[in-house]
Amino acid sequence: RATGDVHLYGKEINDETYAICKSDMMIKGNNPENIRVGSTLSTDEFAGTTFDFMLSTPPYGKSWSSEQKYIKDGKDVIDPRFKITLKNYWGVEEDADAIPRSSDGQLLFLMEMVNKMKPKHQSHSGSRIASVHNGSSLFTGDAGGGESNIRRYIIENDLLEAIIQMPNNLFYNTGITTYIWLLS
């Protein structure tokens, strides 16, 4: 049980789910204004805000091509949430492509949360993330491509705590294998 104040925040694209969440927040005495409706990828409703704990189940295989114009302008990444720096072979830092294929945005949702992590010097324990994914976040993308660079960034910055494979049939009416990514 939490000993301090707990403030809940969230964003939901589905209007019905948004309404249920907002009403649930009111019933339980939480601030319903902290729940926003819309696309997490196209607008950063909580820009500049960091969180202690973050949970998500990004949509599996959801195309984000309709939101590409908010994230990338041609070859340039324009949204700072999705910009990363990696070291090359000689140890020189370089900007790297961190944009996955437009047919699956799961890793973009993960990078959104990584962007909202508290630095360890700001909080005694930093932040913790639990995000439920299917296998594509682990296995897709070519070396040097967006998916590979995101995974590399997470590992090189020592953010990955564990990836837990869950039993099949965890979600109703599907046999998709799921994994929980734990970051801190």
Which residue stretches match the model-derived regions?
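Compositionally biased, intrinsically disordered/low-complexity regions enriched for serine, proline
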Residues: 55-56, 77, 97, 164
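Conserved Class I SAM-dependent methyltransferase catalytic core
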Residues: 91-183
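Conserved S-adenosyl-L-methionine
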Residues: 1-56, 60-76, 107, 134-136, ...
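Surface-exposed acidic, glycine/proline-enriched linker/cap segments
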Residues: 24, 75-99, 109
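A glycine-rich, aromatic-flanked flexible loop/lid motif
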Residues: 69-84, 122-130, 154
